[in-house]
Amino acid sequence: MKLSLLAAAAIAPMVSAHYFFDTLVIDGQETTPNQYVRSNTRPEKYNPTKWVNTRDDMTPDMPDFRCNKGSFTFAGQTDTAEVKAGSKLAMKLGVGATMQHPGPGLVYMSKAPGAANQYEGDGDWFKIHEEGICDTSKDIKTDAWCTWDKDRIEFTIPADLPDGEYLIRSEHIGVHGAHDGQAEFYYECAQVKVTGGGNGNPQDTIKFPGGYQKDDPSFNFSVWGGMKDYPMPGPAVYTGGSGSSTGSYNESNAEDSNEYPYQKESGTCQSNFYRREHARDFSHRRA
């Protein structure tokens, strides 16, 4: 569903505070808003999903946490974009918004058993991209984060991903209130058909809902009190040999480490997280 100019104008004052993804970018070319990205039925489309002080009675423990409230009702009228394995994509925010909350950006994919426009996203999800803190010399409350003031999350489709139709779930998590249990989730799903892929087999997966828990360290993080490491949520990034490099880490180190992921290099948004804390079972599946 496309927003009218009047509705967009009404939303514009809120864009720095709340936002939503509505545009798929394919190899640098922007598509039409909601052409390939499912819309939602929230009264204010930019409202976040939270566990505390909820909006629209939505929490991360509900099935609509997959692609946002009521999004499956738009699946049939949303086109499916054909994209090549290994291609560079982005999910862009609507109405000129930028991400002006501190927090990470993540991208997940889930293979549909058939057509993407008939898939509710109740299968397994694997992560293909993550980005957190880019520059430890900057303010953790604002511009230390890779996503700060950007209008999109950029990522690469793993080159060995099997052909077929998928949902792509882009997500930004605002952690400015996470110290009080009020992490904010902004997310939507695009429908794509991957071609020219390979025989990759992502094993490290989660489900939505269930993959995120209210007591996860990722969602109870404090940006107050100075710079600190951020514990990325979810499973390891599946790169398939040439997926998004931002957010990858060495899993052999992670399994034996009690440390949070940390930034290998500062001053760049190519953030290579190669340690993570396993504070609990993240409800993701390993082979």
Swiss-Prot record:
O2 binds at H176. It comes from Emericella nidulans (strain FGSC A4 / ATCC 38163 / CBS 112.46 / NRRL 194 / M139) (Aspergillus nidulans). One of its GO terms (biological process) is cellulose catabolic process. The gene is LPMO9D. Cu(2+) binds at H18, Y186. Residues 1-17 form the signal peptide. It comes from the Eukaryota. InterPro entries: AA9 (IPR049892), AA9_LPMO (IPR005103). The keyword Secreted applies. Lytic polysaccharide monooxygenase (LPMO) that depolymerizes crystalline and amorphous polysaccharides via the oxidation of scissile alpha- or beta-(1-4)-glycosidic bonds, yielding C1 oxidation products. Catalysis by LPMOs requires the reduction of the active-site copper from Cu(II) to Cu(I) by a reducing agent and H(2)O(2) or O(2) as a cosubstrate. Active on celluloseas as well as on the hemicellulose xyloglucan. Shows synergy with other hydrolases in degrading sorghum stover. Binds 1 copper ion per subunit. It is found in: Secreted. Residues 239-287 are annotated as: Disordered. Residues 274-287 have a biased composition (Basic and acidic residues). Lignocellulose is the most abundant polymeric composite on Earth and is a recalcitrant but promising renewable substrate for industrial biotechnology applications. Together with cellobiose dehydrogenases (CDHs) an enzymatic system capable of oxidative cellulose cleavage is formed, which increases the efficiency of cellulases and put LPMOs at focus of biofuel research. Keywords: Carbohydrate metabolism, Cellulose degradation, Copper, Disulfide bond, Glycoprotein, Metal-binding, Monooxygenase, Oxidoreductase, Polysaccharide degradation, Secreted, Signal. Its main location: secreted. Glycans are attached at N220, N250. Gene3D superfamilies: 2.70.50.70. This is AA9 family lytic polysaccharide monooxygenase D.
